[in-house]
Amino acid sequence: MFYKIAQKVMFQMDPEKAHHLAIASLKATANTPLDCFYAQKFTQAPVEFMGVTFPNPVGLAAGMDKDGECIDGFHAMGFGHIEVGTVTPRPQPGNDLPRLFRLKPAKAIINRMGFNNKGVDNLVANLKAAKSGALVGVNIGKNKDTPVEQGKDDYLICMEKVYEYSAYIAVNISSPNTPGLRSLQYGDLLDDLLGSLKAKQKDLAEKHGKYVPIALKIAPDLSSEEIEKIADSLIRNQFDGAIATNTTLSRDGVSGLMNSNEAGGLSGKPLNSLSTAVIKQLSDCLKGEIPIIGVGGINTASDALDKLDAGAQMVQIYSGFIYQGPKLIQDIVEAYRAR
């Protein structure tokens, strides 16, 4: 009930201003008696994934809490993990405003944020300050002004700084809003990046005495051949996991709606079937060797189960969480326990 009231107010506001207000409110009320307005307690359903035991299979996708300011608040809602970021080595403002658009009739969102964040050092401070014990994945990327050919260096910088404080690290090479970024999904650039990250992981595991798994986040806008090549590279480089998928450049399911022609990545309900199809193809190619987090368009518990049936072991929500509220977390966990 509280969320529906808050949502009604927020949906009257500019989307990005509403987002900032939500983050500020959550940050201010976490670990106080006021968190009773959104905290949820329900029977958990532990999942073993990439060698880590998660309390349940439902995570918050990257992009909601870019700077890790609300880890404790989101943990109180019942998320099994929170993926913060995307974070870059240096702070950057992102793309020009406006850059976030609701398509309410389709339960969808278009964004062209452009990795706006306060930088990796700020994120590390927030990771250290979190009190809840939440399992946090850190989604890392490259700065906009770093040439694609040198992008690997940005990922290695971020990885080294967040490693000690992460449950896992997600490598984002699939956002459509950073020029040239998606080219890292192909050929020698991909192999070089994955190989370098695995070598760095080995060094950091020895340094810190802990093994932090790394997962690759891919786009939905890939051909079957491209998915096969990515899967082959993941297996050859012994990556720990995959996250499928990021937002799409497609406008299927939203054509004609207000804001549908805005540039950027589309998320929400219209992405669901495309994302699930990519998960199925990727799972078939990986042959059970590498586990998958399924994300993209989950709006109901049934949507989440479809992704698990397609080959994912865990799921993440973002747009569906905005439209449905925290109850979606509990709904998915209960459906997972009952299957």
From Swiss-Prot:
Protein name: Dihydroorotate dehydrogenase (quinone)
Assembly: Monomer.
Taxonomic lineage: Bacteria, Pseudomonadati, Pseudomonadota, Gammaproteobacteria, Alteromonadales
Membrane-related topology note: Peripheral membrane protein
Organism: Shewanella sediminis (strain HAW-EB3)
Pathway membership, UniProt: Pyrimidine metabolism; UMP biosynthesis via de novo pathway; orotate from (S)-dihydroorotate (quinone route): step 1/1
Reaction(s) the record says it catalyses: (S)-dihydroorotate + a quinone = orotate + a quinol
Pfam family, any one: DHO_dh
Molecular function as annotated in GO: dihydroorotate dehydrogenase (quinone) activity
Family that this chain belongs to: Belongs to the dihydroorotate dehydrogenase family. Type 2 subfamily.
Active-site residues, record numbering mapped to chain: S175
Source superkingdom: Bacteria
Binding site for substrate: K66, N111, R112, M113, G114, F115, N172, N177, N246, T247
Keyword entries, A-Z: Cell membrane, Flavoprotein, FMN, Membrane, Oxidoreductase, Pyrimidine biosynthesis
Gene: pyrD
